[in-house]
C-alpha cells in the first residue's frame, strides 16, 4: 500500500492521507480537508480518486468532501452514525469491514468511540501483518483526542485500553493532526525525567517546520505518550498526577481512572 501524508496548513494542523492499493490501483483519501490541495496532488500523479473515508463528523475532517465528490464522483464512507452528518456520506462501515482489499493488503475498520460516537480508525494490513494505523482524532503522537464536542473520556479510555494497548509495537501511527511538540511538552510537564520524550522533542526541533514530520510507531508511543502508560505509569508520572487530581477521582492501580485524570489535566493545560 502506498501511503502519502499531506499537511494541510490548516489552523488545527490537520493531516489528510492518500492511500493507493499497489495491486488494484484503487485510491482512497482519508479525512480530506482541502479538495483543491488533494486534486493538485492527484493530478501530479495522473490518478483519479475512488473513495473517501471520514474518520468522524467534525468539519475539519470533512470539508474537502464536496469538491472531491463533484470532481471524481467518489464513494464516501463513514461510521454508520455519520450518515446524515457527514457531507455526501452514503456507505456505512462497521467494525471488521474492509477497504482497498486485495490479495496482499487491505484496510480493516475499527469502531473507536470516545472523541465522538461515530469515529472509526483504519488498520493497514500487508501480507497478513499489521503495518500502520490511521487514527483520526482518537490518538495523536504523544497524546489523544479531546472529548469536548460529542465525546466521552471514559469511553475514549475504554477504546484505547482495549483496542490499542494490545496492538503490535511495530505498527506506524498516522494521526489526524500534528500536535507532537505540544503533546511532548505536556508529557514532560508531568514526567520531566522522560528521556525518550526529551530526545523526541529535540528531534522535532531539527525538522523543517510545517514541511517535515516525525512518524512514530507504537513502541515509541508507549515511551512518550502518557496515555499509553496508564497501566504502568512511572513513579514520577503517578506522583505528579496525584498531586493535581483529587484522591477520590484517582483510584489506585486503575488504568481507566488514570487515563481520565490525564485527559482532564490535558484539557486544563
From Swiss-Prot:
It catalyses: an S-(2-hydroxyacyl)glutathione + H2O = a 2-hydroxy carboxylate + glutathione + H(+). It comes from the Bacteria. Binds 2 Zn(2+) ions per subunit. InterPro entries: Clx_II_MBL (IPR035680), Glyoxalase_II_hydrolase (IPR050110), HAGH_C (IPR032282), Hydroxyacylglutathione_Hdrlase (IPR017782), Metallo-B-lactamas (IPR001279), RibonucZ/Hydroxyglut_hydro (IPR036866). Its EC number is 3.1.2.6. Keywords: Hydrolase, Metal-binding, Zinc. Its cofactor is Zn(2+). One of its GO terms (biological process) is methylglyoxal catabolic process to D-lactate via S-lactoyl-glutathione. Zn(2+) 1 binds at residues 56, 58, 115, 137. Zn(2+) 2 binds at residues 60-61, 137, 177. Pfam families: HAGH_C, Lactamase_B. Pathway: Secondary metabolite metabolism; methylglyoxal degradation; (R)-lactate from methylglyoxal: step 2/2. GO terms for molecular function: hydroxyacylglutathione hydrolase activity; metal ion binding. Belongs to the metallo-beta-lactamase superfamily. Glyoxalase II family. Monomer. Thiolesterase that catalyzes the hydrolysis of S-D-lactoyl-glutathione to form glutathione and D-lactic acid. This is Hydroxyacylglutathione hydrolase. The lineage of its organism: Bacteria, Pseudomonadati, Spirochaetota, Spirochaetia, Leptospirales.
